[in-house]
Amino acid sequence: MNLNFYTLCVIYLVYSFLGWVAETVVATAKGRRFTNRGVASGPFCFVYGTAGVLITIGLNDQRASLAALFFGSMIYATVVEWLTAKLLERIHHRRWWDYSDKKFNLDGYVCLQYSLLWGLLGMAAVRWGNDLLFRLCAHLPPLLFHAVVWVGMALAVLDQISAMVVVSRYANRHPRLGQLNRELGRGSERLRQKITASVEKRIQRAYPAAARPEPTTSAEKQLSLADLLWLFVIGAFLGDVVETIFCRITAGVWMSRSSLVWGPFSVVWGLALVLAAILLRGGEQKSESRIFWFGVILGGAYEYVCSAVTELLFGTVFWDYSGFKFNLGGRINLLYCFFWGIAAVTWIRYGYPLVAKGMKAVKRRIRPWMTALLAVFMAVNLVTSALALARYDARTSGAAPANAVDVLLDEHFDNARMERIYPNAKKVEKAG
């Protein structure tokens, strides 16, 4: 099975549609009337598509083991559902579903009953469903297939954007979203109000928990994009420093642990701290054991996905735990999953409060142009690193430079430099 942009888009669209069909049928059967479970007007439940893509990427090399597929799918899909619920609550200050009345639930966001169902669905999709789907797509002429994918993705993106605008009343405490909504609605306010009223009534019928008048506890002060950018950079830098020192202590050598070609920044750690700041804030009252196991599960799933995605994009594995006991495909191992748990406790209890206090102290001294300059630098750094890695993969496969950009990359990011920046990178031989 060849995974690429088009096949992953097909998985995303088809499973989003099938998820919408399943949710709508179940909700209609329970309520004995038609209930559209889509958030906006399109027939999509994107949590299913997102879970399908992540499960396919992450577990494609585990297809021979039904047990690995079942438990892996259960974990990944549960994490996606939990993240989706938390993000929706953070943005809209409302819960869109609540499993508090079900046994073995986690804060009402997820429950064992549906996690087991996710495991079965994910196992069936990766083992049999994807192949069947790709065989059906193979009957379409390539040009038509590509056109259908692009049109479908365009509709999906528009559907998600319209959903954000339509439910803006739930996000009236988010000033930026409110401002965006006012700008989009200028000149067609009357039509927008009619559409909004109609769709909101449907959403409230489909997601009764979202219609609760009282806001949830997540209606706390929001982190701005500037805050998240600085958190990302701080987390990426500290993660690189910690990993470098750890390698020195355990392996006896100094080596680069950076994800980027310019500067000591670990993208994996930067993104992890940003996600933790968004999703785990307010968890200070939770017990340390609960935070620890949250970190073990979420961190392990996150690291596995990062490994699978970077291998898919760049044909390279940046870490390999095959020599460790209790590893899964060499992508994660139990010991380092425990480290994620320790990191979660440390971050929630001590790290984030300390960093937040420091950021608050220096925030008045940070000018907007400084944040803008940092954003431009990190964006250029990320794009250049991605291009350099892609060219490194092509160059080591014997591909000659195809354009001026390739020539420039070969000149400034030759094999010696790339191997110095990414000393543990291993090229994955493509099948066939």
Please report, for each region that a protein language model flagged, where it lies by residue.
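Aromatic-rich, lipid-facing transmembrane alpha helices and their immediate juxtamembrane interface loops
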Residues: 1-432
